[in-house]
């Protein structure tokens, strides 16, 4: 007994559609990024100001919306968690760069590109910050750090999986920034560290 292709096509379509509706396990992504697992860096300053330098660079809000914690928020939280005031003078932490670049991969060619998974992309996060100390007696000190990290995400990720992967990329970038900045503080701002 032979089955004609035309008769089997609707059944095949239903089977394929049912396979597409398989349940997807949610991926947990924290809604904030904290740096309080390490002790704060106690500075001999009365307060620590946090500001962001306006570089005039274009911000792609569509790309930033993919991040549970955008890089500029992560940098502000780093300064709040890691820099502790306790003396005289002023500390000023300036966010010089907190950018994300997205390079989209082209969709697959042919029918796969029309119905296949969404294409992936390469994401590059660059963060740069500067800490200045303005002492009561007019002394000044400064250190800075700049870190860039990139990751290519494969196509077909769920929105939750992509958000988690970008969170992990942000965390890796900020972990490297934290290490560089702490080294710089201890090396160049040691007179103001308790």
Briefly describe each language-model feature range.
Residues 41-101:
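N-terminal segment of the mature soluble domain
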Residues 60-63, 105-108, 157-159:
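Short acidic, glycine/proline-rich loop/turn micro-motifs
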Residues 83-85, 97-99, 129-137, 149-155, ...:
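Beta-strand elements of well-folded, non-transmembrane domains
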């Amino acid at each position: 007994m032979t089955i004609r292709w035309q008769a089997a096509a609707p059944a095949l379509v239903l089977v394929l559609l049912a396979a597409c509706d398989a349940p997807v396990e949610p991926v947990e992504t924290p809604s904030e990024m904290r740096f309080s697992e390490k002790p704060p860096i106690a500075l001999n300053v009365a307060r620590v100001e946090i500001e962001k330098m306006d570089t005039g660079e274009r911000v792609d809000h569509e790309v930033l919306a993919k991040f549970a914690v955008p890089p500029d928020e992560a940098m502000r939280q780093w300064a709040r968690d890691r820099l502790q005031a306790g003396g005289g003078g002023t500390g000023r932490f300036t966010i010089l760069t907190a950018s994300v670049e997205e390079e989209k991969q082209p969709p697959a060619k042919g029918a796969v590109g029309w119905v296949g998974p969404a294409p992936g992309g390469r994401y590059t996060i660059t963060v740069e910050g500067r800490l200045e100390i303005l002492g009561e007696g007019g002394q000044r000190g400064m250190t800075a750090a700049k870190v860039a990290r990139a990751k290519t995400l494969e196509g077909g990720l769920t929105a939750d999986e992509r958000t988690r992967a970008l969170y992990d990329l942000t965390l890796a970038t900020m972990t490297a920034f934290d290490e560089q900045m702490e080294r710089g503080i201890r090396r160049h701002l040691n007179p103001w560290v308790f």
